[in-house]
A protein has these predicted regions:
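Extracellular loop and loop/strand-boundary signature of outer-membrane beta-barrel proteins
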Residues: 1, 41-46, 81-86, 119-122
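Membrane-embedded beta-strand positions of outer-membrane beta-barrel proteins
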Residues: 6, 15-17, 59, 73-75, ...
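Short loop/turn motifs that connect adjacent beta-strands in outer-membrane beta-barrel proteins
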Residues: 11-12, 64-71, 103-112, 125, ...
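Outer-membrane beta-barrel "beta-signal"
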Residues: 57, 96-100, 126-141
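Residues that define the transmembrane beta-barrel architecture of outer-membrane proteins
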Residues: 2, 46, 51-55, 90-94, ...
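C-terminal hydrophobic structural anchor segments
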Residues: 52-104
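Outer-membrane beta-barrel pore domains and translocons
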Residues: 1-3, 20-22, 62, 76-80, ...
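Flexible, solvent-exposed coil segments and beta strand-coil junctions
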Residues: 33-41, 77
Length: 141
């Protein structure tokens, strides 16, 4: 696997792109259910099929630049093609996330994260997912 990603940030905006290619006699193996540590490890799709080529574009915004610290937005689009199955197949995924972490007061560190995933593939049936996460940061030291 050869994988690379570049990002550029300015005034609260972050723009990025990446490319990944796999080669060999099979897709990337998962050992004991391990996770792939690559930008292609998206919300639903993994983009690690035999000979698959994947490109990704992403955008993020930190609303602290507008005076709203703790509020962030990000979105990304991944497109994989030339993966081998019984035929040459393709897949794509679009992810979006809106998150907020309370910055001060009684609930400082409490966060809520809304995620939307849309996945389409020739490998399997397409899937959409909406998720909500609640987090709480606790300083140990």
């Amino acid at each position: 696997m050869l994988s690379g990603q570049l990002s550029y940030a300015i005034s609260g905006h972050t723009f990025g792109g990446g490319y990944q290619t796999l080669s060999g006699d099979a897709g990337l193996p998962f050992i004991s259910g391990a996770t792939v540590y690559s930008f292609s490890n998206a919300g639903i799709g993994k983009f690690v099929e035999e000979d698959e080529k994947t490109w990704m574009l992403n955008y993020g915004y930190n609303f602290a630049a507008l005076g709203v610290p703790g509020l962030t937005f990000s979105t990304r689009y991944l497109s994989g093609n030339d993966g081998k199955s019984t035929t040459t197949v393709k897949e794509w995924e679009r992810d979006a996330e809106l998150a907020y972490i309370v910055q001060q007061g009684t609930f400082k560190g409490l966060g809520v994260r809304l995620r939307n995933y849309v996945y389409r593939s020739d490998y399997s049936r397409g899937r959409d997912s909406n998720r909500i996460y609640f987090t709480y940061d606790i300083a140990l030291w």
